[in-house]
A protein has these predicted regions:
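Conserved catalytic-core motifs of GNAT/GCN5-like acyltransferases
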Residues: 131-132, 147-165
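GNAT-family acyltransferases
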Residues: 1-94, 119, 160-184
Length: 184
């Protein structure tokens, strides 16, 4: 299997529709999978609006959507929030992702998270926040494998789930050793 990260495009329409059918009654996560998709061109336009921060609903932030594909098969979806507002900083974080049910257990979630983290670094996000439900132990392990450190746990109002809030610290690329005295 050779996977690559792509931007949403018409080329993957049938695979996207098959992915949605395969999800059945599961929660469609990240949120882009829950958008109306009967008019696929309109869906692509809406994702482009999210990418560019144009005509997005109140409370949302500009968000990049990435698809992990194997050939012409859509196997995973990630969303990268380009910055955090107060609500998303509290519960949501920068990255959300999901893997197609028939492709789970193959390490693709880890791959998708790693390449989405690379995309976050490319746009200048230094400290990356990734949150998951405490009951989703596989996601917690995946976040830790990708450098995440558990910062806190949060219980939201009447919601029964505890949210674990992880942070991937900024890479320490700014450290430059001082030259030794007398060296050129």
């Amino acid at each position: 299997m050779t996977v690559k990260l792509v931007l949403p495009s018409l080329e993957y329409e049938q695979s996207y529709r098959d992915y949605i059918v395969e999800l059945g009654d599961e929660e469609r996560y990240p949120f882009q999978l829950d958008l109306e998709h009967n008019d696929f061109c309109a869906l692509l336009e809406r994702l482009d609006h999210f990418l560019n921060g144009v005509n997005i609903p109140s409370g949302y932030v500009p968000t990049s959507t990435f698809w992990l594909v194997d050939g012409h098969e859509l196997v995973g979806v990630s969303s990268l929030r380009q910055y955090l507002n107060e609500a998303i900083a509290e519960c949501g974080g920068h990255i959300g992702l999901g893997v197609r049910p028939s492709y789970r257990g193959l390490g693709l979630g880890n791959t998708l998270m790693a390449v989405t983290i690379q995309e976050a670094r490319k746009i200048g996000i230094e400290e990356i926040h990734i949150h998951c439900h405490k009951s989703n132990e596989a996601s917690g392990r995946m976040i830790v494998r990708n450098g995440g450190v558990l910062r806190s746990e949060l219980k939201l109002g009447q919601h029964p789930e505890t949210v674990q809030r992880y942070v991937l610290p900024a890479p320490n690329n700014s450290f430059k050793p001082k030259p030794l005295r007398g060296s050129a």
